[in-house]
Amino acid sequence: MKQTNADKLGTSFGFIAGAVFILSGILWPSEFSNLALWLESSGEAESYNKYMIQILRFFDLKSIFIVMGGTVSATFIAFPYRKALRSFGSITKIFSADHAEHATQEVYDQSKIIAEKRYSGKRITNDDLNNLENPFMRRWIEGLIVREQVEDEALHQILKSEVAMYEQRADEEIEILDFMATAAPAFGMVGTIVGLVLMLAETGSIRSVMQAMSIAMLTTLYGVILSNMVLLPIASKRKQLKESNLILLEMIRESVHRIARREAPYTILQELHMFLPHKRDEFDQQYG
């Protein structure tokens, strides 16, 4: 019930915020929207470098309200707000996209240590667990091997379910990013229409007409840039990260499952060997 109420709140927030952003794009004073035009009208432009003024011409508050505000608001309307917030947070994950590739070697080395202790009948200590850098591996080793909580088949299903759960969450984040990439150019067109209507309604100076025209042009530019240079690349990077992490989680699942069965370290390491990046590259070159 709490989740349902939270989703309703997020949807309501999206509608209200979207209306506020669109109305702000319409009603915000044009003289305070485009920074370069404001500097020129106030006589302050001469104190700035001409290249800086050219750059500032592309900064427009009305366009930002409509495109960015509209895109975010539509996302909260379309998706449960917790998932929407999580997708925004996932943007930071793209900067660790290469981590999973390096983590496979760490898992391989740590599996070797744990497998040797498990096979020889030695107790796995808290220090051993603390040395496991991957949180999935640490939790699975602690809960499923050290405490001997479940049987072999149940262990296999638990690990498989957790990997599937991660894949589902990653797919949801990618879906939301793809939605935002589609929505951004659409709101760019909304801003273009708003700018054209304001321009046609303008009966004052040429400067006022140019201010309205800048909104029409810049919203389209913002929508295209936000979609094609920000959101689509981030979604693509997130897909790559998902695939890398699925390989890593599958490697950990295989390792934990075999360690729990007290298989020989050599056998375990032979199975894990193909998960290492250089071995996958060799396989792709040979059979790709």
Regions found by a protein language model. Give the residues of each.
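Large intracellular
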Residues: M1-G10, S24, W28-E173, N245-G288
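Helix-termination/interfacial motifs at the ends of transmembrane alpha-helices
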Residues: K2-E46, Y166-Q240
